[in-house]
């Protein structure tokens, strides 16, 4: 399976078919076989710390280790925060005050500030409302087009797949069963 620059490939399929495992293997979070390349450089034979920062991984539920939102950000990119509906005051918020949608939008900002060369998105809008979903989709598409990066997105939502995918791959029993444009 390969993904071109600026392409959004969506993986879908029944629960338990390995969609999230594919993302975790690419992000080198689990042992795997096969080769992974980014910008024509073979990653799997290099040290993970040499390339892992180039891959941005956003899980369905983001991790928050500190109490305040501001402790999670080394820098404040006004444009990214504004595009997702925040101003500087959000840095003073307690993480527990944030809704699930706000946490996902903040996690996306945190990820994009790292300027990844590829995005791995594991159902990033699965448990959030329509407004937050559309904001996240729009931001990812804009970033992807601006930086011409590949995006591998796991989704179960058929309408979302139609909106975001350049290509769609269905998995069943840990195998690719169908591909479409």
Q: What is each stretch, according to the model?
A:
Residues 27:
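Helix-to-loop junction immediately C-terminal to a conserved catalytic motif
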Residues 94-98, 102:
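Conserved ABC ATPase signature
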